[in-house]
Amino acid sequence: MGRDIYKDETLTIPEGVSVDIKARLVTVKGPRGVLKQNLRRVDIELKKQGNTIKFIVWHGSRKHNACIRTAYSIINNMIIGVTQGFRYKMRLVYAHFPININLTENGTVVEIRNFLGERITRVIKCLPGVTVSISSAVKDEIIIEGNSLENVSQSAANIKQICNVRNKDIRKFLDGIYVSERGNIEELE
């Protein structure tokens, strides 16, 4: 396998968003807030030139070149997060025992009761910057919102994972909380 001498990718920064890069510590500021990400573990060169960011790899192998697109996607998701935000919608699915959900601490802690008729209360603490609300338009739906895609999606995964059915046939017992829709809070025209 050969090595590429030089490989780069360019990301354009939209209006109203400022990006600051210091020693691969990226800070993105926008109308919805501020996000920070440490990219020191990714061995690439980041340069901010005007309203663009350039990702550069010198003498990179195939895996090293793949880091360009990873860093590109991370920063692009941060830009989308501070301009539009991220929203996950999850549906409560049950056959017999209705699942009860309570939100505490301003929608940052989710309590799940009566899952498969069990007496225990399952408690999930959401990651920082993530809020959970119960949908008023659709029955048995919760909405998870935040600016960081990583935190919103990980909080949704934690809620889904705590409701795994164990020691039963999962083809028959479909009860749980599942992601039904993913998108942005503010859609751009």
Curated annotation (Swiss-Prot):
The keyword Cytoplasm applies. GO terms for biological process: cytoplasmic translation. It is found in: Cytoplasm; Nucleus; Nucleus, Nucleolus. GO terms for cellular component: cytosol; cytosolic large ribosomal subunit; nucleolus; nucleus. Gene3D superfamilies: Ribosomal protein L6, alpha-beta domain (3.90.930.12). One of its GO terms (molecular function) is rRNA binding. Transmembrane segments: none annotated. The keyword Nucleus applies. Pfam families: Ribosomal_L6. Keywords: Cytoplasm, Nucleus, Ribonucleoprotein, Ribosomal protein. SUPFAM superfamilies: Ribosomal protein L6 (SSF56053). There are 2 genes for uL6 in S.pombe. Component of the large ribosomal subunit (LSU). Mature yeast ribosomes consist of a small (40S) and a large (60S) subunit. The 40S small subunit contains 1 molecule of ribosomal RNA (18S rRNA) and at least 33 different proteins. The large 60S subunit contains 3 rRNA molecules (25S, 5.8S and 5S rRNA) and at least 46 different proteins. Component of the ribosome, a large ribonucleoprotein complex responsible for the synthesis of proteins in the cell. The small ribosomal subunit (SSU) binds messenger RNAs (mRNAs) and translates the encoded message by selecting cognate aminoacyl-transfer RNA (tRNA) molecules. The large subunit (LSU) contains the ribosomal catalytic site termed the peptidyl transferase center (PTC), which catalyzes the formation of peptide bonds, thereby polymerizing the amino acids delivered by tRNAs into a polypeptide chain. Belongs to the universal ribosomal protein uL6 family. PANTHER family: 60S RIBOSOMAL PROTEIN L9, 60S/50S RIBOSOMAL PROTEIN L6/L9. This is Large ribosomal subunit protein uL6B. It comes from Schizosaccharomyces pombe (strain 972 / ATCC 24843).
